[in-house]
Amino acid sequence: MKKVRIGVLGAYRGTSMINYCKRADHAEVVAICDKSPEALDAQRAAAEGLDIAFYERFDDFIEHNMDAVVLANYANEHAPFAIRCLKKGLHVFSEVLPVQNMKEAVELVEAVEESGLVYAYGENYCTCPRPMK
């Protein structure tokens, strides 16, 4: 089975997803982007020996060869960055909040429909039994 190549935007908030993908048989992290050099340095240290590219600029990150992007960045950036990813041909998994207003909601829905790609909104359920253990 071909692994899904995943890029993660948000090195701090995205740490759980990065760690999950490192262990998964069906996915691999191929790129990590964050504005913070310190956050990238921490992920570089944790990724020693793995073939992961690191970016400080989203414009460079989005050009990397990947299949999907996890948006674990600032909430006010989720819709604009999701739309850019979809237009680039990338599937999107977005953390909360997906949009800031109705205009962004309409633009995001239109981008998903036009692209035919998967957009997933990852609501956290911290009160579910498993996370509470």
Feature locations, PLM:
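N-terminal Rossmann-like dinucleotide-binding module
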Residues: 1-49
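Acidic-histidine catalytic/liganding microenvironments
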Residues: 23-26, 64, 128
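Local beta-strand N-terminus motif with an aromatic residue
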Residues: 29, 51, 66-69
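General small-molecule cofactor/ligand-binding pocket signal
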Residues: 30, 53-55, 120
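Short acidic low-complexity segments
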Residues: 52-64
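Beta-strand-loop-alpha-helix segment that lines the small-molecule cofactor/substrate pocket
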Residues: 67-68, 74, 79-127
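Oxidoreductase and adenylate-handling cofactor-binding alpha/beta cores
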Residues: 127-133
